[in-house]
């Protein structure tokens, strides 16, 4: 067990003939006791300071660990968001490409259909024109026919006179 200042103060020595001067020994022990008290007080203060610093180090270590975990969680979340964004972007691009292909195919189909309708209308137009031309020519032939002249020479009064 370590010495205490009281152990030093209360220490008694046996007296012998030609021993140490008692006053000198007591003065020395008193000085040793004071110095020892100072050392013990400083030791206690330093131990308290060490404990306080250990607690602070522990606290900061906990904060550091918490921050590191938070950083890892944030990084993982950022990676998840990035991966999900990339997947979503790929899906959007794929969907846009499908829509573009569909629109192009529909446009091509419509343009082919319109081209076929135009060709059909051209054929119908030629047929109509030919028939119309034939009709007009037939009408012109009727106009050029001498029967018109014969009708003009026909007299209506003569028809009524004959019947009477």
UniProtKB/Swiss-Prot annotation:
Its main location: cytoplasm. Induction: Constitutively expressed. Changing residue 19 to A: Localized at cytoplasmic foci. It is found in: Cytoplasm. GO terms for molecular function: identical protein binding. Keywords: Cell cycle, Cell division, Coiled coil, Cytoplasm, Septation, Sporulation. The keyword Cytoplasm applies. It comes from the Bacteria. Disulfide bonds: none annotated. GO terms for biological process: division septum assembly; peptidoglycan-based cell wall biogenesis; sporulation resulting in formation of a cellular spore. One of its GO terms (cellular component) is cytoplasm. Disruption phenotype: Misplacement of the septum during cell division, resulting in the formation of small, circular, anucleate minicells. Residues 29-107 form a coiled coil. Oligomers. Interacts with FtsZ, MinD, MinJ and Spo0J. The association with Spo0J is transient and occurs at a specific point during development. Belongs to the DivIVA family. Overexpression of DivIVA is lethal. NCBIfam families: DivI1A_domain. May act as a pilot protein, directing MinCD to the polar septation sites or by inhibiting MinCD at the midcell site of division. Required for polar localization of the chromosome during sporulation. This is Septum site-determining protein DivIVA. It comes from Bacillus subtilis (strain 168).
